């Protein structure tokens, strides 16, 4: 039996907005507070960052569990997603900019300036590691899923060069070039639904039941309306995702894949400072056994960047969508890691 999960429009969360200073960007985030009878004061605050293509609801199985520990939980729709602004320019999506945006969400909820715990998945993990680099004073612990920390690089390389070295990430080129965006944004809601089903493990009906998403290639945009339902996402939740993605289309989420050179340029000064950098907070990285693009061995040697220790875990039976695929195992590991802060 799956653990308790948030539903779309769940009364346990409240909806909040913040306009980031010096920008025209508005973020939407969910805020959940623990039961005041059991926890008159939250034990700590957790910021959860989702990945691609997801929403704040991607953490639906974790939020009730975190509330049961007395934690206050903040879950933004990331830039380009849901009810958050979706600017057209890729430059708005740099990890440096996004880190700055997160500081304002943290400070709006936590005006005392107390550091928060950080939970991340996929692109949210890429961002989370950079947030902790740029603003270490705001973070007191990190648990990340599927994306290990990698230090800033001293050389700017293109996405094409990166994919030459890592062909298992070929889908990123398809995303960056706009092929999927053009097909989905210019099509029906059924095409959008097919794309989302493909991302969440749906099968290509006319291709012998193979996965509709291939990390080496991406998706066959001509067959999106033929993709079967996701085995991981209920019809109710998928309906919600389709409505949320219908609002602004998928250019915003795809823009995250157009920022490689922007991010590397931003991080050149960090690369010099971070040669011997170590995070000064406890951290945990959780990898999975069924994600061909992100194998567990990517964490090899990662320990040297963590002065307070790094816990490394693998959930062998899980796919990339570990938060919803194996929520019991996720919550168990998160609960064990967070005990030191409670």
Swiss-Prot record:
Gene Ontology MF term list: hydrolase activity
Broad enzyme group: hydrolase
All residue ranges annotated as the AB hydrolase-1 domain in the record: 44-332
Site-annotated residues for Contributes to the formation of an oxyanion binding site for the epoxide oxygen of substrate: 171, 257
InterPro entries found in the cross-reference section: AB_hydrolase_1, AB_hydrolase_fold, Epox_hydrolase-like
Coiled coil: none
Keywords: Hydrolase
Database matches in Pfam families: Abhydrolase_1
Record-listed E.C. numbers: 3.3.2.-
Induction (UniProt): Expression is up-regulated during sexual development. Expression is also up-regulated during confrontation with the arthropod fungivore Drosophila melanogaster.
SUPFAM superfamilies registered for this protein in UniProt: alpha/beta-Hydrolases
Catalytic residues of the enzyme: 122, 320
PANTHER family to which the protein is assigned, alphabetical: EPOXIDE HYDROLASE (PTHR43329)
Function: Highly reducing polyketide synthase; part of the gene cluster that mediates the biosynthesis of sordarial, a salicylic aldehyde structurally related to the phytotoxin pyriculol. The most interesting aspect of this pathway is formation of an aromatic product from the highly reducing polyketide synthase srdA. SrdA synthesizes a reduced polyketide chain from one molecule of acetyl-CoA and five molecules of malonyl-CoA. The polyketide chain is then reductively released as an aldehyde.
Sequence similarity: Belongs to the AB hydrolase superfamily. Epoxide hydrolase family.
Annotated protein name in UniProt: Epoxide hydrolase srdG
Record organism: Neurospora crassa (strain ATCC 24698 / 74-OR23-1A / CBS 708.71 / DSM 1257 / FGSC 987)
Originating gene: srdG
């Amino acid at each position: 039996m799956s653990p308790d999960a948030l539903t779309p429009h769940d009364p346990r969360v409240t909806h909040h907005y913040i306009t980031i200073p010096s920008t025209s960007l508005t973020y939407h985030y969910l805020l959940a507070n623990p039961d005041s009878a059991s926890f008159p004061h939250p034990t700590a605050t957790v910021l959860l960052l989702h990945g691609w293509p997801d929403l704040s609801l991607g953490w639906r199985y974790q939020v009730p569990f975190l509330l049961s520990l007395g934690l206050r939980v903040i879950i933004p729709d990331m830039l380009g997603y849901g009810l958050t602004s979706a600017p057209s320019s890729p430059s708005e999506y740099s990890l440096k900019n996004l880190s700055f945006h997160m500081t304002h969400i943290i400070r709006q909820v936590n005006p005392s300036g107390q550091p928060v715990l950080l939970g991340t998945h996929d692109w949210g993990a890429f961002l989370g590691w950079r947030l902790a680099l740029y603003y270490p004073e705001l973070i007191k612990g990190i648990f990340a899923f599927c994306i290990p920390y990698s230090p800033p690089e001293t050389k700017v390389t293109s996405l094409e060069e990166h994919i030459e070295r890592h062909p298992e990430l070929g889908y990123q080129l398809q995303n960056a070039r706009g092929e999927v965006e053009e097909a989905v944004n210019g099509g029906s809601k059924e095409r959008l639904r097919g794309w989302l089903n493909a991302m969440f493990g749906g099968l290509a009906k006319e291709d012998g039941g193979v996965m509709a998403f291939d990390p080496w290639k991406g998706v066959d945009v001509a067959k999106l309306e033929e993709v079967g339902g996701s085995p991981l996402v209920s019809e109710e939740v998928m309906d919600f995702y389709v409505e949320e993605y219908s609002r602004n289309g998928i250019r915003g989420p795809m823009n995250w894949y157009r920022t490689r050179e922007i991010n590397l340029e931003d991080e050149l000064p960090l690369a010099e400072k971070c040669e011997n950098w170590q995070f000064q907070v406890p951290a945990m990285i959780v990898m999975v056994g069924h994600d061909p693009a992100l194998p567990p061995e990517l964490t090899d040697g990662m320990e040297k960047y963590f002065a307070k220790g790094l816990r490394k875990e693998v959930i062998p039976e899980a796919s990339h969508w570990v938060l919803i695929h194996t929520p019991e195992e996720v919550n168990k590991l998160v609960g064990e890691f967070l005990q030191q802060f409670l």
